[in-house]
A protein has these predicted regions:
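Conserved catalytic core of the tyrosine transesterase superfamily
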Residues: 1-186
């Protein structure tokens, strides 16, 4: 399976690889069959766009269930980042944390960076995809842009230090360009 060929309209620069939603769902389905932790970790990364170093440091105390927010401590370039979480993932996360039943505040996903890279690669291989954890972050951003999210808001959600970093996600597949072109009436 191949990644999507994408371009920035301004200078046809290749941008980061990403997965279509269907590909992410396929990977999540494979993970769910093997491990609840792996499934939730991958879903959390895709639905929040967090980096590996950020997800492995999330503790139960970082989760604000009432506000559907997770506080990411030690976020790259910032002391803290607040990411939003959809209700379904929040519910799964709540159930998972309750099942951990630990009196302390250990990481929700007690796993190393190398282990995250390995499991992402393993589940990607099930769909013949050569991916890495940051592919999920890129996919998160692309899906939000395609859904109409403004770049400034995506910048805040992603924790990017500048808007120019976020602009890389203003990309279009060949099919997207064709569809937009055909909608124009001459």
């Amino acid at each position: 399976m191949r990644f999507n060929k994408t371009y920035l309209l301004s200078n046809a620069t290749k941008i980061p690889d990403y997965l279509e939603k269907e590909q992410v769902v396929e990977i999540l389905r494979a993970a769910k069959l093997c491990s609840q932790r792996d499934f939730l970790l991958l879903r959390f990364m895709w639905r929040t766009g967090v980096r590996v170093s950020e997800v492995i440091n999330v503790t139960p105390n970082d989760i604000e269930y009432k506000n559907s927010v997770v506080n990411i401590r030690k976020a790259k370039g910032r002391p803290q980042l607040r990411v939003l979480l959809d209700q379904e993932t929040l519910r799964m996360l709540s159930d998972y944390v309750l099942a951990l039943n630990t009196p302390e505040d250990p990481p929700v996903f007690p796993i190393s960076r190398a282990q995250v890279f390995n499991l992402v690669k393993r589940y990607g291989d099930t769909g013949d995809l050569k991916i890495h954890p940051h592919t999920l972050r890129h996919s998160f951003a692309i899906h939000l842009v395609r859904s109409g999210m403004e770049l400034r808001r995506l910048q805040l959600l992603s924790g990017h230090s500048s808007l120019s970093i976020t602009q890389v996600y203003l990309q279009f597949k060949d099919d997207d360009l064709r569809e937009a072109y055909e909608r124009v009436s001459f």
